[in-house]
Amino acid sequence: RFKNELLLRYIKYKIPRKMTIAKILKAMDLEEMQPFLDEAELTADTLLTKENYEDIVKVFTIHWDIVTEHYRRSNNAAKAYYKAAVGNSKSAVIVDIGWAASGFSALRYLIEDEWKLDCKVRGLVAGSTYLHDMDIIEPQMTNDIITSYMFSQRINREIRRDHDVKRMYGAFTEIMLSAPAPSFIGFDFDDDGRIKYEFDYPEAEGYSMINEIQDGIHDFVNDYTKHFAKYPCMMNICGSDAYAVCRQVISCPEYFSNLFADYPVNRAVGSASFETGSLGKLIENEFVK
């Protein structure tokens, strides 16, 4: 069901990165696809381009059974994990920053449709904006399966229009909400059959900066709740007010860059697939004024 999403995120979105097919397959952990790509004259050292993208997709589509079989073990481990986590619950909420809710949508499909865990899943996202995923998120928002806090096509549309992903606004917001830990990749089983968690390469150079950001968030929350303890209505913060913090950051990219110029940033899915750069260099190269 989410074949197109996988191909978009792991292949199409990487066209500007000037990556080889070998690096793309490594990021996807699908090196066994290389012989089939070789048959189509798409060798390991071939650079991904907009001209050969459809040819690559065609090979993946023809041999999609290889892809699904490769990820079957991870799927089974994920099922075991979420079955234990859900337990006897009849409903659950998944919280994510956004922006297209593709991760939530895939997990909801697995829990409700493929694994049939008898649990209805709802999603909460900070904001909803997207380039290619309207058919995934919009029907779910219309049916109240997904609720967006700060902005979406349904609420605070003026904020959604201003939140330009091409100007790195999404990246700035995600940095503010990052964790001092490697990105989670997926599930697997160890040699004893127990569930284990797999993580991407740690970008440890940024952990101290993340901790500073989170300390600042905690300080603000503590001060806010202290000063308004007698006014519970002040705890009901609307999405547009919450976005004021994001707006302050994205309206001053130079200030943000001065504070976090050395923050490590990987613009591609899978650290093994692309050399990590710095936020300062990224703003210099990609920010559209």
Question: What are these model-derived regions, one by one?
Answer:
Residues K3-K289:
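Long, contiguous domain-sized segments
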